[in-house]
């Protein structure tokens, strides 16, 4: 997985989430990070068109995220928790 990681777009994005939501965000974000590292093998050397904003939903969780291929990171833009 090289140096790939995930991070929220702002420091306080996850602050108000209940523990179950935070655990779900961490799990999904880790899975996305692994998947993206396997999809974009060139990482920092990537020269193609990067993907735009994407959404993933798991149960009561919906994440909007952006893959920064050259930065080898998944940036969580928005979190919705219906629970």
Question: What are these regions, as identified by a protein language model?
Answer:
Residues 13, 28-31:
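Residues that form generic nucleotide/phosphate-binding pockets
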Residues 30-57:
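A short, surface-exposed loop/turn module that caps and links secondary-structure elements
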Residues 1-3, 22, 27, 53-83:
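Enriched for short, Lys/Arg-rich terminal
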Residues 1, 5, 34-36:
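Charged, low-complexity, helix/coiled-coil-prone segments
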Residues 12-23:
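Surface-exposed, Lys/Arg-rich phosphate-binding patches that contact polyanionic backbones
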């Amino acid at each position: 997985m090289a140096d790939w990681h995930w991070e929220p777009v702002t420091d306080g994005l996850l602050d108000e989430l209940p523990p179950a939501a935070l655990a779900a965000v961490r799990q999904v974000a880790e899975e996305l990070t692994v998947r993206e590292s396997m999809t974009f093998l060139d990482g920092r050397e990537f020269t193609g068109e990067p993907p735009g904003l994407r959404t993933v939903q798991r149960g009561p969780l919906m994440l909007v995220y952006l893959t920064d291929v050259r930065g080898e990171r998944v940036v969580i833009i928005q979190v919705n928790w219906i629970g």
